[in-house]
Amino acid sequence: MSNKTKFLAVGLVASAAFFTSLIKYEGYSLKPYKDTGGVATIGIGSTKYEDGTSVKITDKPIDQKRAVQVAQAHISKDEQAFRKSLQGVKVAQVEYDVYLDFIYNFGQSNWRSSSMLSNLKAGQYVAACRSLLKWKYVAKRDCSIRSNGCYGVWIRQVDRYSKCMGANL
């Protein structure tokens, strides 16, 4: 399958490349920690458990197997809402993975109100890719500035943008 072939999003699922990239950027933290935005996080960047309970900094550590379970549950919920938001829209597998990763990182509500989604619905794929670069702020800090302490967020956005553009040019 070509990296540029587009399919209805309803028929796609997160690829192995999605999970590899997720682990690359989120890593494994078996103990709760505060993420760049100050939110309690555990495992592979999870802020909530399967039942919707928020991670607390005082939660007990988990093992790697449990980290994967929690992340898969989070991704599964995100995917359902993601596919629904893209009814009738065709995307390449790479785009599906990129935007799902965005949702995992920034949340469903940010996705639903984003210019990425409106551009995709309008068939403006390159504009949707470019919209990724607008998302460079965390806790009012510009993450494209290395000294702001959130540069990894920007690096991840640039990676998403590059992958997305690769599927569209």
Question: Over which residues does each language-model region extend?
Answer:
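Long, amphipathic alpha-helical surface segments
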Residues: 1-11, 17-38, 46-48, 65-73, ...
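Generic structural motif recognizing short loop/turn segments at the entrances and edges of beta-strands
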Residues: 29, 36-40, 53, 58, ...
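Small-residue-enriched, tightly packed secondary-structure blocks
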Residues: 38-40, 44, 96, 100
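Acidic/histidine-rich, surface-exposed loop or edge segments in extracytoplasmic proteins
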Residues: 45-63
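Mid-length scaffold segments of soluble, non-membrane domains
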Residues: 60-115
